[in-house]
Amino acid sequence: MTGDGIILWEAHRGGGYELPESTPVGFEYAWMLGGTPEADVNATADGRLLSLHDGKLGRTAREIDEETGRTPIAELPYARVRRCDIGSDRYPEQVIPSIDELLAKLRGDVRKEIVIDYKNAPLEQLSELIARFGVAKQLTLATTDEAVAARFRQLQPEVRIKIWLGGAPGEITARFDALAAREFGGFEQVQIHMNDDPERKFWRYALPPDEVRRMLAAAQAKGVLLQALPWQFEREDLFAVLDLGVRSFAVDYPNRFCLLCAEYFAVRTWEKPLR
């Protein structure tokens, strides 16, 4: 998306809340909107890597027995997990995609990229898959664990690394400042979670705008991309974050986000009088 710069955005858990999360249709939806879907990586009992946020099936799978729903993915064979439908009434019969299926999509189209959020899988196995498909430059590994990030940097130096920071505002700023003091660990991206402020005194989020602006400047000074994840947003909320200069987002509402960004830049493009 053009304007005063490029908007780089990620669809949280694939299709966000607009389509069933971590599904084939959700990933395609994000790609077709021009974004980068996020895939959470977990491993099954027989060693297959797949994209599912939770360590269990109970929340997302439809019509499964209670025992299967509460059993950790790491204790289930891939064939059993693959039989589960994680779609919805509108989008039924959606299977859990394997990581190799998603990487094959990247290999088939160099314009596609993906974010892999590390959950529970052998890093060496994930690295081997990426090498097999030759798609390292189309990938970002996301994690909150700097030790995981450092290890994966050794395994796959061409894969971009993103450290995500969650929690209360004080926790986020403390971790950010510690990262900045270490030159951001040599990693390319930092994501800050923007939780709602229950009081909403002058803007929606608990993290004050001055802090967001300060972190953005610190990241830019070192060539690091700062990404915001606003869990909820309306028009005025997103516009306020864009006004701070943030140009990278992770969102749960991809289509609404794209429409609002188009409006934001369209309005500002025509603010100056024509000559």
Language model: regions and residue ranges:
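Phosphate-group recognition and catalysis centered on beta-loop-alpha active-site segments
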Residues: 1-275
